């Protein structure tokens, strides 16, 4: 799977960072899922190769505006782009009427079915070989993370088993490879009996705002990539004597190290953290240095519009 970050700033945008939005992209490179939709997300999409027609579902982690204010515009643009397929939108119940009323008040017509689902009672979503679950987090308001699990990735035909079962090479093999049930000599052949994954399935967790990384302990077992907010560094929290429901780079890094997370992506940075080499104020390098002091795995500080690929060897790498 791939990740592309459409917004990595906390609270407000900066000149270099938009507010929260993350795309999780299927291994095929086409279908994708949007986690959060801060204001301006549709503008970021114009600067990416992602198509609204290939969007499988939208997931909103919590009600705060920097995670959802981009929804009405994005939905309207999806309709104007010619999308016809139904679009599942999983988000807190408190936002449902806001979206409905916003579309109605602006006389916005959607040529597709908007399938609103309550996040509080959400019990999973499946599309093709991707399953999405949720995990409850800790913030000033109810907040969740989403777990993306692959099932049977990149299956290949078990030709030895086919031959042993007397199924000759030919069109039947092609149909089974495409996941079709076929009939041979009066028998129904289930494609799942003849398909094997070429690599281990991948798991990616994308979190909303959270001040208790340890809540992820169980789900982090076997995770390939953890995407977690890192709004502040410890000196900022110490001066303020409050976390405001957010995590520091050190807190997330300590958890990821203890949980043996192989790839840690930090995002949702306070606007105070400017680019490397900033003339004044805090630098994003402060976040990196604090995390590296506690974490020995592959650390990534998310950048707007940067795409990352989870390779076969399990390492998350930039797509150049």
Curated annotation (Swiss-Prot):
> What residues sit in the active site?
66
**Which keywords fit this entry according to its UniProt record?**
Endonuclease, Hydrolase, Metal-binding, Nuclease, tRNA processing, Zinc
Its Enzyme Commission number?
3.1.26.11
Cystine bridges = none
Q: Out of the domains of life, which is the source? A: Bacteria
* Catalytic activity of the protein: Endonucleolytic cleavage of RNA, removing extra 3' nucleotides from tRNA precursor, generating 3' termini of tRNAs. A 3'-hydroxy group is left at the tRNA terminus and a 5'-phosphoryl group is left at the trailer molecule
Q: Which InterPro entries match?
A: Metallo-B-lactamas, RibonucZ/Hydroxyglut_hydro, RNase_Z/BN
Q: How does the cofactor attach, per the note? A: Binds 2 Zn(2+) ions.
Q: How does it assemble?
A: Homodimer.
What function does this protein fulfil?
A: Zinc phosphodiesterase, which displays some tRNA 3'-processing endonuclease activity. Probably involved in tRNA maturation, by removing a 3'-trailer from precursor tRNA.
What's the family?
A: Belongs to the RNase Z family.
What the entry lists under PANTHER family is as follows: ZINC PHOSPHODIESTERASE ELAC PROTEIN 1
Recorded protein name is Ribonuclease Z
Q: Which organism is it from?
A: Pseudomonas entomophila (strain L48)
What lineage does the source organism belong to?
Bacteria, Pseudomonadati, Pseudomonadota, Gammaproteobacteria, Pseudomonadales
Q: What gene name is given for the protein in this entry?
A: rnz
């Amino acid at each position: 799977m791939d990740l592309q970050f459409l917004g990595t700033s906390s609270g407000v945008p900066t000149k270099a960072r938009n507010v929260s939005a993350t795309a999780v992209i299927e291994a095929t490179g086409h279908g994708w899922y949007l986690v959060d939709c801060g204001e301006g997300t549709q503008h970021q999409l114009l600067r990416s190769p992602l198509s609204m027609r290939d969007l499988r579902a939208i997931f909103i982690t919590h009600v705060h505006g920097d995670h959802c204010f981009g929804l009405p515009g994005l939905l309207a643009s999806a309709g104007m782009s010619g999308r016809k397929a139904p679009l599942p939108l999983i988000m807190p119940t408190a936002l449902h009427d806001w979206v409905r009323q916003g579309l109605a008040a602006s006389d916005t017509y959607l040529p597709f079915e908007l399938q609103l689902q309550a996040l509080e009672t959400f019990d999973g979503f499946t599309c093709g070989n991707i399953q999405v679950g949720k995990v409850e987090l800790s913030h000033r308001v109810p907040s969740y993370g989403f777990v993306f699990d692959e099932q049977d990735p990149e299956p290949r035909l078990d030709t030895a088993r086919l031959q042993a079962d007397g199924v000759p090479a030919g069109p039947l093999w092609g149909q089974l490879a495409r996941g079709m049930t076929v009939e041979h000599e009066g028998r129904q052949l289930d494609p799942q009996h003849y398909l094997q994954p070429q690599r281990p399935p991948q798991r990616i967790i994308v979190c909303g705002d959270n001040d208790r990384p340890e809540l992820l302990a169980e789900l982090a077992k076997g995770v390939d990539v953890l995407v977690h907010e890192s709004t502040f560094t410890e000196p900022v929290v110490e001066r303020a004597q409050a976390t405001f429901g957010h995590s520091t780079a050190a807190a997330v890094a300590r958890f990821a190290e203890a949980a043996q997370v192989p790839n840690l992506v930090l995002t949702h940075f306070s606007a105070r953290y400017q680019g490397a080499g900033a003339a004044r104020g805090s630098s994003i390098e402060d976040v990196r240095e604090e995390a590296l002091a506690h974490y020995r795995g592959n650390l990534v500080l998310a950048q707007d519009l940067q795409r990352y690929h989870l390779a076969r060897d399990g390492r998350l790498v930039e797509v150049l």
